[in-house]
């Protein structure tokens, strides 16, 4: 008498079809990211610069996420006017180039192209003349010292440049004084801890415990590259579905400066 055949998963079988499937065994999310993130970032940005399908996908995803801008509606007319005077001017941008809607688009583009973005809150003095004494600075993930991994004397730990306390809560980001790819030799490239409450770290969490983001298109980057090099004019089937919505750049808004806008 033979027993019933054991149920199996096709993905776990060993056969001719799976002979070339070399999957890593039980790696954690941060170990996987640490091994390949720098290379993935470089290749993603190369695609964004040189591949028309990649540029189209990035523009479409950004357009899908934020369009011409996500608006805030306040119940108070006075607060609405004050908010609008700040958010719809370059006062909001620490670099003085974009309004709030432009920053939304920039953040979305950084997340798509680089896997994540750091949003830094930069408080200002009331005497600086801004309608709201706060500016927003958008940083690429390269600013984080991902080579920094160690234990701290208070029972915490640092994983790829992000410091946690003994409870596993983020307390600091270890940042370089400038983008490591734009070294001007004005600074010593030694990372320093910055309080975590000054930042919003925007990225998609694919696995529990993941501390850094990875680009959403990393699984189809090779497909895109191969098809474009072979002369194919058809977009890769594995490209993110929202990339087929529109090839246009998100609609732009007029940017105005309101350094001395009325608060009344």
Where are these regions (language model features)?
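Structured, contiguous alpha/beta core segments that scaffold functional sites
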Residues: 1-60, 69, 99-102, 108-264
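Low-complexity, highly charged intrinsically disordered N-terminal segments
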Residues: 62-91, 103-107
């Amino acid at each position: 008498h033979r027993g019933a055949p054991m149920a199996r998963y096709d993905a776990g079988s060993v056969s001719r079809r799976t002979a070339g499937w070399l999957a890593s065994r039980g790696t954690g999310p941060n170990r996987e990211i640490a091994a390949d993130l720098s290379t993935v970032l470089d290749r993603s940005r190369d695609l964004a610069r040189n591949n028309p399908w990649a540029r189209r996908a990035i523009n479409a995803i950004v357009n899908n996420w934020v369009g011409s801008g996500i608006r805030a509606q306040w119940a108070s007319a006075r607060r609405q006017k004050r908010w609008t005077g700040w958010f719809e001017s370059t006062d909001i941008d620490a670099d003085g180039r974009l309004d709030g809607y432009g920053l939304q688009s920039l953040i979305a583009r950084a997340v798509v192209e680089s896997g994540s973005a750091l949003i830094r809150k930069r408080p200002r003095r009331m005497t600086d003349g801004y309608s709201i004494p706060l500016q927003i600075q958008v940083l690429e993930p390269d600013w984080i010292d991902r080579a920094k991994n160690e234990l701290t004397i208070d029972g915490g730990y640092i994983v790829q440049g992000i410091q946690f306390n003994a409870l596993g809560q983020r307390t600091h980001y270890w940042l370089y004084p400038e983008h490591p790819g734009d070294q001007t030799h004005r600074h010593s490239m030694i990372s320093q801890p910055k309080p975590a409450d000054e930042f919003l770290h925007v990225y998609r969490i694919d696995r529990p415990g993941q501390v850094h983001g990875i680009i959403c298109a990393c699984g189809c980057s090779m497909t895109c590259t191969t098809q474009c090099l072979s002369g194919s004019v058809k977009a890769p089937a594995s490209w993110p579905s929202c990339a087929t919505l529109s090839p246009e750049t998100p609609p732009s808004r007029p940017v105005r400066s309101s350094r001395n806008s009325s608060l009344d």
